[in-house]
């Protein structure tokens, strides 16, 4: 693991870097370049998904990096149309082949799709992949507390991670509470709120000026000090480097309080209770 990024110890003892590189909305050929840049900058965790269409480019960059496989933490996700026990196992094989890997470090159910009611069977297939040593940890993404409670009641393995939309405008207090109770790591997607106004908020700009940092670095540091795992995405080399330079300063109590006061429970992405796109 990179010495620059400290690890989070997941509930099964596996170490996951607290900051990783996301490739959502990055075309395959561009993903290869971006992941190569990220690995050179010191990132050792890469977050992709079947639906992103860039598992191949991600895998090529990992192979070309020359880094030992065990030094890179790879996450991918099962897409909604593949939910169900047997179809999950087939979809995993496809993802693994595209990535060119023998195993993935973390496999996530991308969305719960409660209206289709397949996430429990899907997760049971995840448990088989874990038992067979094909994944090192299993988890979920975009699961609301009610979905987590059902999963905990009907399956055997507590999810290692729940990756959810989380940023200063959507702080997810209830989700983080159940995660803490159950030993589930909280991972933030869109940790910078997709930049939509968040990085111009006066409170964040003022804290950035105080620390001589960028607003993005301030928001990432806020996440890290809360204990969240973060996966900022960028295809701009300077931003990729900027986003990992957040381990040599700290926010004080007043800074953290000022950012925590910005919560509006405002989602930028879909509502997991109703989202059912396959």
Regions found by a protein language model. Give the residues of each.
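N-terminal binding-site loop/beta-alpha segment at the start of enzyme catalytic domains
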Residues: 1-72, 278
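Alpha-helical scaffolding within the catalytic cores
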Residues: 2-8, 56-63, 91-94, 145-148, ...
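Residues at the N-termini of beta-strands
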Residues: 45, 103-106, 137, 161
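Acidic-and-aromatic substrate-binding clefts and catalytic sites of carbohydrate-active enzymes
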Residues: 26-29, 49-57, 81-86, 114-117, ...
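A short, structured active-site edge motif that brings together acidic residues
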Residues: 69-82, 106-112, 166
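Beta/alpha (TIM)-barrel catalytic core signal, keyed to glycine-rich beta->alpha loops juxtaposed to Asp/Glu
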Residues: 112-278
């Amino acid at each position: 693991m990179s010495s620059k990024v400290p690890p989070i110890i997941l509930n099964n003892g596996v170490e996951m870097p607290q900051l990783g590189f996301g490739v959502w909305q990055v075309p395959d050929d561009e993903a290869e370049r971006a992941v190569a840049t990220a690995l050179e900058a010191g990132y050792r965790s890469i977050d992709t998904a079947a639906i992103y269409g860039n598992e191949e480019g991600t895998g090529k960059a990992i192979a070309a990096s020359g880094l030992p496989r065990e030094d890179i933490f790879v996450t991918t996700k099962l897409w909604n149309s593949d939910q169900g026990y047997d179809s999950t196992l087939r979809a995993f094989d496809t993802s693994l082949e595209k990535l060119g890997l023998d195993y993935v470090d973390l496999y996530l159910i991308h969305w719960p799709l409660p209206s289709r009611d397949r996430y429990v069977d899907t997760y049971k297939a995840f448990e088989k992949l874990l038992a067979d040593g094909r994944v090192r940890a299993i988890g979920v993404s975009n699961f609301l507390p009610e979905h987590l409670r059902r999963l905990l009641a009907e399956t055997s393995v507590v999810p290692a991670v729940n990756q959810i939309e989380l940023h200063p405008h959507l702080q997810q207090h209830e989700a983080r509470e159940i995660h803490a109770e159950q030993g589930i790591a909280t991972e933030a997607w869109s940790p910078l709120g997709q930049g939509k106004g968040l990085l111009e908020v006066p409170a964040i700009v003022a804290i950035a000026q105080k620390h001589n940092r960028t607003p993005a670095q301030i928001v990432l540091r806020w996440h890290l000090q809360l204990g969240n795992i973060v996966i900022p995405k960028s295809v701009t080399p300077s931003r990729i480097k900027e986003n990992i330079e957040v381990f040599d300063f700290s926010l004080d109590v007043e800074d953290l309080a000022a950012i925590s006061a910005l919560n509006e429970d405002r989602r930028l992405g879909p509502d997991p209770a109703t989202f059912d796109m396959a």
